[in-house]
Amino acid sequence: MRLRKVKDALVRVQDSPYFSNPEQLSTIESESLFVEIGCGKSWFLSQQAQQNPKCFFVGIEREPTIVLKAINKVNRLEVKPRNLLITCLDANQLTEYLKPQSISKIFINFPDPWPKKRHTLRRLTAPHFLKQFHQLLKKQGLIEFKTDNDQLFEFTLEVLQKTVAHFKIIEQTTDLHNSPLTSTNIMTEYEQRFVSLGVKIKKLTLEKLN
């Protein structure tokens, strides 16, 4: 379904306590900074924030209209988190606004698989993205990656084989909801839909090396 863009979406959220301009991200002080790249409408992010009040969560979304929808959704929560911000930013720009070794964990949930070969570099698990994430993560920082797409999952495994100096796989499953990992899993809205259709969810957890 094509997204209906909202005019002046970012203007509407400028005064929200849950919105951050990218330039403000480097001022966040937290021993446990968690970042979700492509936070969508913020269900997963807000659940994480509520369940982990001692951590700080930042949602990255490049489409202003989705940023607006995400913040509106947080505003409708009965219990509103105080440890959450959402910003409008492309994943390629993360290293411009976040300090090196400042992030404890990165979540990549159901990213666009970009199936065409000419779009390989747009995949969030492409080598240049993993290199950026390695730079941003603290020592032994983590990446949690979930997808319903078999091809993207296999692509990611192939990339990791070629970049073994950067990350090691500490959790891996091709059927998350029939694995022990489901006990601590928080589902995204996409994930709920996929599971209801019987789609198997793939997951990797990566730990930073060096």
Swiss-Prot record:
List of residues binding substrate: K116, D148, T188, E189, Y190, E191
SUPFAM superfamilies named among the record's database cross-references: S-adenosyl-L-methionine-dependent methyltransferases
Residues annotated to bind S-adenosyl-L-methionine: E36, E61, D90, D112
Location of the active site: D112
Catalysed reaction equations from the record: guanosine(46) in tRNA + S-adenosyl-L-methionine = N(7)-methylguanosine(46) in tRNA + S-adenosyl-L-homocysteine
Top-level enzyme category: transferase
Pathway the protein takes part in: tRNA modification; N(7)-methylguanine-tRNA biosynthesis
E.C. code: 2.1.1.33
UniProtKB keywords: Methyltransferase, S-adenosyl-L-methionine, Transferase, tRNA processing
GO cellular component, one term: tRNA methyltransferase complex
Pfam (any one): Methyltransf_4
Gene3D superfamilies per UniProt: Vaccinia Virus protein VP39
Molecular function GO terms recorded: tRNA (guanine(46)-N7)-methyltransferase activity
Described purpose of this protein according to its UniProt entry: Catalyzes the formation of N(7)-methylguanine at position 46 (m7G46) in tRNA.
UniProt similarity note: Belongs to the class I-like SAM-binding methyltransferase superfamily. TrmB family.
PANTHER family: 3-DEOXY-D-MANNO-OCTULOSONIC-ACID TRANSFERASE/TRNA GUANINE-N 7 - -METHYLTRANSFERASE (PTHR23417), PENTACOTRIPEPTIDE-REPEAT REGION OF PRORP DOMAIN-CONTAINING PROTEIN (PTHR23417:SF14)
HAMAP family reported for this sequence: tRNA_methyltr_TrmB
Protein name: tRNA (guanine-N(7)-)-methyltransferase
Species whose genome carries this gene: Mycoplasma pneumoniae (strain ATCC 29342 / M129 / Subtype 1) (Mycoplasmoides pneumoniae)
